[in-house]
Amino acid sequence: MGRPRTARVFMNVRVTTMDAELEFAIQQSTTGKQLFDQVVKTIGLREVWFFGLQYTDSKGDLTWIKLYKKVMSQDVQKGDPLQFKFRAKFYPEDVAEELIQDITLRLFYLQVKNAILSDEIYCPPETSVLLASYAVQARHGDYNKTTHVPGFLVNDRLLPQRVIDQHKMSKDEWENSITTWWQEHRGMLREDAMMEYLKIAQDLEMYGVNYFEIRNKKGTELWLGVDALGLNIYEKDDRLTPKIGFPWSEIRNISFNDRKFIIKPIDKKAPDFVFFAPRVRINKRILALCMGNHELYMRRRKPDTIDVQQMKAQAREEKNAKQQEREKLQLALAARERAEKKQQEYEDRLRTMQEEMERSQANLIEAQEMIRRLEDQLKQLQFAKDELEARQNELQVMIKRLEESKNMEVAERQKLEDEIRAKQEEVQKIQEEVSVKDTETKRLQEEVEEARRKQNEAAAALLAATTTPNHHHVDEEEEDNEEELTNGAENGTSRDYSKDFDTDEHIKDPVEERRTLAERNERLHDQLKALKQDLALSRDDTMETANDKIHRENVRQGRDKYKTLREIRKGNTKRRVDQFENM
């Protein structure tokens, strides 16, 4: 009988990215690189050089997995499944120049945003609000007052708790402030909003810096900051303002022996830069980060590899396709907005026409009533005139009889005279009535003339209200304009104890010409200034932190991230090493 085949032993692994959880089953022989490759293949990431797998070791410290060692032989905290985090280990010097894929952009954006919200990266209040507006654009797209009603952002984590605690503002007030700036980003793609977020965030002093507790030869407790631009030394109580800096271009070798860490400058006249870490494992981490950052620093200053060139070409194609799709969408949105605007115009005009018709109808009725009253008055006047004429005729007959009857008896004559007087009084009374009615009729005739004028105006207004003028027809030129718009339309390896670095004395320190985005962009500068003024009205100074005070003093003295880096890199290497020893 043959020997039974040994069953393969698999371990369950859970890898948490910034926006997903992945589960794998690995063998005892699986290396860190094999697991890493499986992760990046699953999520479609090609810019692998920025990232690593992080785990909590048996002592509770966060550690980066070693790519060329078996996963099971590393000090991973036991559990089922084994827990790992997929995180950015190295940061680009300039996100706009280096990040190629959308997935890379998204992972960096989510990691940096989380670091800002948890206060791992200090961010001043006004910048926090502006960044929040880009975060909302990245998540929700364009602001829409119909969909994004008050309270819409209540469950979104948008600001560091420190910023909220420092200002006497309600949730609604915070939302209003963020929404005001959110509306400024209308038409911006979600990926562009993430990029704008990172372009602002990379100017923050603590962005992309890994801090390590160290001591100099005097035993002074300090911080060592390792980032994409070099090494910086910070005083223990200030991680915002480095005091001494060494760019990667000045360093030719890094090594450590036990807890002693040695950095050899290119300038052979300069003494070694020596510091001490509390534990050997810290020195291993420092060395690994220095190696990776230095390699990327040098790689940026060489021509792109074929792989990177292909990635950039593909990214450009995808961006162009997305841009064309965006333009189509914007055209469709613009057409919809125009249609909605015209619909509103027609509704407003229809309402105006209705009101004009009602007013005209009322004027017409009033004019008709006036004419009817005049006609009645004219009839009464004519009746009075006819009656007056009849009485006058009767009076003439009576007078004639009086003149002809000279032989009439006295009594009879007296009676006739009395009748004549009575008739004269009656005629006089009727004449007065006719005179009054005549005056009233003239007044009414004037009113009728006015009424007829109003009637004509009302009829003309009624006709105008029911007729659409030519300028309300759709302009075909709009479609021509739309047609024109449519047509216009790189894994790091690590070695223990010592590492010689590639050097190039001709490399110019990138910090020399670097400026913050706010310094280069007047609009951003004005936005931050306006936000700072608005927030100052509700600020609670009693809640100010040590970092707030340091930041305020730096601003007062006109310092920013790159001005400080330029300042602390001045002078020769020996002077800066001596300065470090004397801290």
UniProtKB/Swiss-Prot annotation:
Residue ranges of every copy of the FERM domain listed in the record: 11-301
Signal peptide: none
Compartments, as annotated in UniProt: Cell junction, Adherens junction; Cell projection, Microvillus; Cell projection, Rhabdomere; Cell membrane
Keyword annotations from UniProtKB, A to Z: Actin-binding, Cell junction, Cell membrane, Cell projection, Cytoplasm, Cytoskeleton, Membrane, Phosphoprotein
Domain of life where this protein originates: Eukaryota
Region (Disordered) location: 466-518, 539-558
PTM sites of type Phosphothreonine: 564
Compositional bias annotation for Basic and acidic residues: 496-518
A cellular component annotation (GO) from this entry: microvillus
A Pfam match: FERM_N
Main localization of the protein described in the UniProt heading: other
Alphabetical list of PROSITE patterns matching this protein: FERM_1, FERM_2, FERM_3
One MF term in the entry's GO annotations: actin binding
InterPro entries for this protein: Band_41_domain (IPR019749), ERM (IPR011174), ERM_C_dom (IPR011259), ERM_FERM_C (IPR041789), ERM_helical (IPR046810), Ez/rad/moesin-like (IPR000798), FERM/acyl-CoA-bd_prot_sf (IPR014352), FERM_2 (IPR035963)
Function recorded in the entry: Involved in connections of major cytoskeletal structures to the plasma membrane.
Protein name per its UniProtKB record: Moesin/ezrin/radixin homolog 1
Organism: Aedes aegypti
